[in-house]
């Protein structure tokens, strides 16, 4: 299947173009490619392409859906006929007849499908990772139980529209630049239904539908991420009699976690450690989605080193296995030191670089003369004791 071109590209417009710009451009292109005027090969297909782009972009609701979801947002929500329904083509022929054949001529549009709805669902990091069932309350329109959706008062029924004779369409003919164009527009009296209600239902005032609320449970699968869309078929607004209800689209939003971040199916976390733990090594308990686990920090670990905890990440959608947890080590530098800690660090610096401050050397020499020799711990043990006590 060929990939559809971008509607804005077809009309040569940008996404911030006004409705007037869209209408003006369409009229110009439609006049150029209308098959009654342009007999070149491909002109009719070009005209259809232009008309489809205009039908979507000239309608605020369809345009918003397209801007957000692209062609998928239009194809999933509207039938081919719904795309063109209600658009003002400015007299450039019978668009319905051109797209759908002569069978559309003279017939009512038929019952309209219900509108799709969207609901933003917020879940915690853990709920998205493990899956959760959430109860939601959706405002929507439902079929009126009093009139069964007809809009007519009980005991009565809708009548044929006198304005269009029940066709749902009004045809007009006009001449432009010496050419005669036939236009079919939706009947304004019956809005394309072919019927009118003379005695409206007292419950829905003739609309056939009423506002209501629907409580339901939504299953968010393990591994869901922000932006994921769940489609619940038939849970949108009610359609007209004989037409299906729209769908409900649940947009998942995952709230931020205090410690964890997510990249694909991996969990990212940071682990602050002391510089003695980094230098000497240590076994440290690390928080994961599945509880605390022991992780070994080898001696000589540098700050920003990353350690991988296998299978401690997010469950993969529609697949087996999990991601990993990536733990980035952050070495903390102490800001308040005791004299003992400073002395030990000076000694460490001397052993590392062979240079010791003269004042410290004299002080330590005098101290050693006044003390009796005794067995002492190694330098690293002293440093560890001093900084972890």
UniProtKB/Swiss-Prot annotation:
It is found in: Cytoplasm. Residues 6-70 form the J domain. GO terms for biological process: chaperone cofactor-dependent protein refolding; DNA replication; protein refolding; response to heat. Binds 2 Zn(2+) ions per monomer. Its cofactor is Zn(2+). Zn(2+) 1 binds at residues 144, 147, 201, 204. Keywords: Chaperone, Cytoplasm, DNA replication, Metal-binding, Repeat, Stress response, Zinc, Zinc-finger. GO terms for cellular component: cytoplasm. It comes from the Archaea. CXXCXGXG motif repeats lie at residues 144-151, 161-168, 187-194, 201-208. Gene3D superfamilies: DnaJ domain, Heat shock protein DnaJ, cysteine-rich domain, Urease metallochaperone UreE, N-terminal domain. A zinc finger (CR-type) spans 131-213. One of its GO terms (molecular function) is ATP binding. Homodimer. Belongs to the DnaJ family. Participates actively in the response to hyperosmotic and heat shock by preventing the aggregation of stress-denatured proteins and by disaggregating proteins, also in an autonomous, DnaK-independent fashion. Unfolded proteins bind initially to DnaJ; upon interaction with the DnaJ-bound protein, DnaK hydrolyzes its bound ATP, resulting in the formation of a stable complex. GrpE releases ADP from DnaK; ATP binding to DnaK triggers the release of the substrate protein, thus completing the reaction cycle. The J domain is necessary and sufficient to stimulate DnaK ATPase activity. Zinc center 1 plays an important role in the autonomous, DnaK-independent chaperone activity of DnaJ. Zinc center 2 is essential for interaction with DnaK and for DnaJ activity. This is Chaperone protein DnaJ.
